[in-house]
Curated annotation (Swiss-Prot):
Function of the molecule: Endonuclease that specifically degrades the RNA of RNA-DNA hybrids.
Co-factor note (free text): Manganese or magnesium. Binds 1 divalent metal ion per monomer in the absence of substrate. May bind a second metal ion after substrate binding.
Gene: rnhB
EC number annotated for this UniProt entry: 3.1.26.4
Stated name of the protein: Ribonuclease HII
Reactions mediated catalytically: Endonucleolytic cleavage to 5'-phosphomonoester
Subcellular location field: Cytoplasm
A Gene Ontology term for the protein's cellular component: cytoplasm
PROSITE patterns hit by this protein: RNASE_H_2
GO molecular function: manganese ion binding; RNA binding; RNA-DNA hybrid ribonuclease activity
RNase H type-2 domain sequence ranges: 71-262
Keyword flag Nuclease: yes
Organism expressing this protein natively: Streptococcus pyogenes serotype M5 (strain Manfredo)
Keywords assigned: Cytoplasm, Endonuclease, Hydrolase, Manganese, Metal-binding, Nuclease
Length: 263
């Protein structure tokens, strides 16, 4: 009596190598269900191998630094430089050496449906996490570039008192005035796993803040657009005027502030 397709599927779930003899054995099974299960598992293993290779490549900066003797490498990234409303948020994350989190990538490349899951995975595995938040008023005072630096410095400061302190910083396209060895990496959130971890922490943190603001200031679509200048947001500005969280140094908000007819 042949093995049931259900039992074969269960056996295949335990297979992690494309060279496993079970694949060769099942290749001669003419049942359509078996062949579908076989191809499905092979495809899944190929995807896992590709993901492992991608994650390994994203650890290249970290591995080079480990060889130099650095022990606690912090990735730093920000979210929210472009929106018309809300804060700029930065995160500083130290992952364990050689830590890999499946699906972790530049937060802009991660499907929104997976943000929370990967964010929680980072929180569980990280040795230390710091978050820096600079509100719209300070952004208007110092400009968004300087505000981004301040948010990153605050994120690093938030690590004070935690067990693990950074001895090296990998920063997404920014150089900070701080006495810690560092490297600025262009498109760092797509090339360094540590920076990618900071990217998703900053993204989820800011999105949660904007969802809360959406309840306080309805009509602008903050929960969906995170403060960016979407059609709904611009329509809200025309209908209801600016809110206390809008950036008055950003257009078209800046022009509306000078318009005495603005509600």
């Amino acid at each position: 009596m042949s093995t049931s397709i259900k039992a074969i599927k269960e056996s295949l779930e335990a297979v992690t190598s494309l060279s496993d003899p079970l694949f060769q054995e099942l290749a001669t099974d003419a049942r359509l269900g078996v062949q579908k299960a076989l191809k499905s598992r092979q495809k899944a293993i190929q995807a896992d191998l590709a993901e492992e290779e991608r994650l390994e490549a994203m650890l290249s900066y970290e591995k080079a630094l480990y060889k130099e003797g650095y022990q606690a490498i912090a990735g730093i990234d920000e979210v929210g430089r472009g929106p018309l409303a809300g804060p700029v948020v930065a995160a500083c994350v130290i992952l364990p050496q050689h830590c890999k989190i499946k699906g972790l990538n530049d937060s802009k490349k991660i499907p929104k449906s997976k943000h929370e899951t990967i964010y929680q995975a980072v929180k569980e595995k990280a040795l230390a996490i710091g978050i820096g938040i600079i509100d719209n008023q300070l952004i208007d005072e110092v400009n968004i570039y300087e505000a981004t630096k301040l948010a990153m410095l605050e994120a690093i400061k938030q690590l004070e008192g935690q067990l693990t302190q950074p001895d090296y910083l990998l920063i997404d396209a920014m150089t900070l005035d701080i006495a810690i060895s560092q490297q600025s990496i262009l498109k760092g959130d797509a090339n360094s796993l540590s920076i990618a971890a900071a990217s998703i922490v900053a993204k989820v943190t800011r999105d949660q803040m904007m969802a809360n603001y959406d309840r306080i200031f309805p009509g602008y679509g903050f929960a969906k657009n995170a403060g960016y200048g979407t059609k709904e947001h611009l329509q809200g500005l025309k209908a209801y005027g600016i809110t206390p969280i809008h950036r008055k140094s950003f257009e078209p908000v800046k022009s509306m502030c000078c318009d005495s007819t603005n509600p």
